[in-house]
A protein has these predicted regions:
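Flexible, low-complexity junctional segments that flank or bridge functional domains
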Residues: 1-319
Length: 319
């Protein structure tokens, strides 16, 4: 537990310096590499005092011009959300020296432009994260790079997600909860699952993992959830050569299972990865059915709670 708390603090300090430290935000250091170098030093420490000492020594390696005067924030009605920097004032946790170092960085003179974030007019003010190494040759398990990806994401949302104030859960607690999940990754599938679980915490369907297999197959029907059931409600328009496939499913059919797994079970299994429940339901049912020709669906037509007919079908309709 102490190691998780130490790594969480490292995440916060590293991200804070990435976006606030004048030299770091200017791209003068390989900031990923600096994280990977310091990370082992934050494990198995005897006390938080020793942890804070290690972090102070690390921070002091990156010099900058200190600002004289009292720090103040610009008060404006146009500011909806300010970054949460209260944690750097917590001397009971950070100690006086570390807290003072972080406040000096907060108050430092720095250029408006950042090497890592583009907020230009061409992007309509949206944050575009630049100069982030992809590490495409990374294999799993690799704890250092697994944590790097989590730290990148957590801090990007910490400082640039405009709807962070709407999150119902404490963002610091979310970090503590997800570090163990990223430490347990043993494969690429585990890695993608951990990312999906983390992304789901912000409840925004614009966020997700993109890429992967293309959609080669299509179920030629519209599936909607009605009273908690996956119900076929209408058809898609098909090319003439596929017209005979149209009769496989009928409006009113209820999808019960996919690959022998009950729909309710599928939804329960993937809910932790859902950043939007309606979209999750679609992706859980319609997309898996359509992804390839080997999917099997068992359906039944229900009218007034009476089962009229059952179907055992394998979709092989190619787009």
């Amino acid at each position: 537990h102490a190691d998780v708390e130490n790594l969480a603090l490292l995440c916060k300090v590293w991200g804070f310096m990435k976006y606030y430290h004048p030299s770091v935000r200017a791209g003068e250091y390989d900031w990923d590499r600096e994280l990977l170098c310091i990370m082992p030093s934050l494990v198995s420490l005897p006390s938080k005092e020793k942890r804070n000492e290690v972090l102070v020594k690390w921070i002091d390696q990156f010099d900058f011009k200190k600002k004289n005067g009292i720090y103040s924030l610009c008060a404006s009605d146009s500011i909806k959300l300010l970054p949460d920097l209260d944690w750097i004032e917590d001397k009971s946790n950070l100690g006086t020296i570390l807290s003072d170092r972080l406040k000096e960085i907060r108050d430092a003179e720095r250029d408006t432009a950042s090497y890592y974030v583009n907020l230009g007019v061409i992007n309509m003010g949206n944050a575009v994260f630049e100069h982030e190494e992809r590490y495409s040759k990374c294999t799993f398990p690799n704890i250092d790079y697994q944590l790097l990806s989590l730290f990148r994401l957590w801090n990007a949302i910490q400082y640039y997600f405009p709807y962070k104030y709407l999150l119902k859960d404490n963002w610091n607690e979310i970090l503590l909860n997800h570090i163990p999940l990223f430490l347990e990754i043993t494969s690429r599938m585990d890695y993608e699952s951990a990312l999906k679980r983390f992304i789901a915490e912000i409840h925004d369907t614009h966020a997700g993992i993109y890429g992967g297999p293309t959609k080669k197959y299509l179920v030629p029907v519209v599936i909607r959830f009605i009273e908690g059931k996956a119900v076929v409600t209408e058809y898609y328009e098909l090319k003439s050569e596929f017209k005979e496939e149209k009769q496989i499913l009928q409006p009113g059919d209820v999808i019960l299972r996919i690959n022998s797994e009950a729909v309710d079970s599928i939804i329960k299994r993937i809910t932790p990865y859902a950043n939007n429940i309606p979209a999750m339901i679609y992706n859980a049912i319609a997309h898996p059915v359509a992804q390839n020709g080997g999917r099997i669906v068992i359906c039944k037509l229900v009218i007034s709670l009476l089962q009229i007919r059952s179907l055992f079908i394998a979709f092989t309709l190619k787009v």
